[in-house]
Amino acid sequence: MNNTDLLEKIIRHQQNKDPAYPFREHLLMQLCIRVNKKIQNSTSEFFGAYGINHSVYMVLAILSMEEQHCLSPSEISQKLQFTRTNITRITDFLEKAGYIKRTDSREDRRTKKISLTSEGMFFIQRLTLAQNTYLKELWSNLTCDECEMFEVISKKLLAHFSDI
């Protein structure tokens, strides 16, 4: 018996006690939780091989998208919806690694700007190439139609959760 069979058996047992029990809804929720955990673990392992985590990657990615590869910590925090404390921790790490540098803002001396260094640009480019292969492998057992359907359903659920 695999994990999903056991999961269904447990939920079916609850349904047998109460025929109105939302079997499918409970099963879908449990499957989403398990898929999410597997993806998070896999992603953590992938980024861990490069000495970073997903949050660090997101900061590098957002900086690499900017025309001047430069943002203030508060802009990064706002765009990624990360706390200022988390941004400080991440930028401290990235600065020690040589991937970013902090400079005084030209507009306001009280603030700093975070800029990607050439080493940081090289790192994010190398990481992006590896990520292309990783992501294709991660989703390789789904057809194109299944991927589209998963995307539509996921977006619909996320929008619904924003409303409740």
From Swiss-Prot:
Organism: Escherichia coli
Domain HTH marR-type stretches: 25-159
Subcellular location(s) of the protein: Cytoplasm
Gene: papX
Keywords per UniProt: Cytoplasm, DNA-binding, Transcription, Transcription regulation
Full protein name: HTH-type transcriptional regulator PapX
Any GO molecular function: DNA binding
Tagged with keyword Transcription regulation: yes
Keyword S-adenosyl-L-methionine: no
Tree of life domain: Bacteria
Cellular component, GO annotation: cytoplasm
Annotated CDD domains: HTH_ARSR (cd00090)
InterPro entries assigned to the protein according to its UniProt record, in alphabetical order: ArsR-like_HTH, HTH_MarR-typ, Tscrpt_reg_MarR-type_CS, WH-like_DNA-bd_sf, WH_DNA-bd_sf
Pfam families (alphabetical): MarR_2
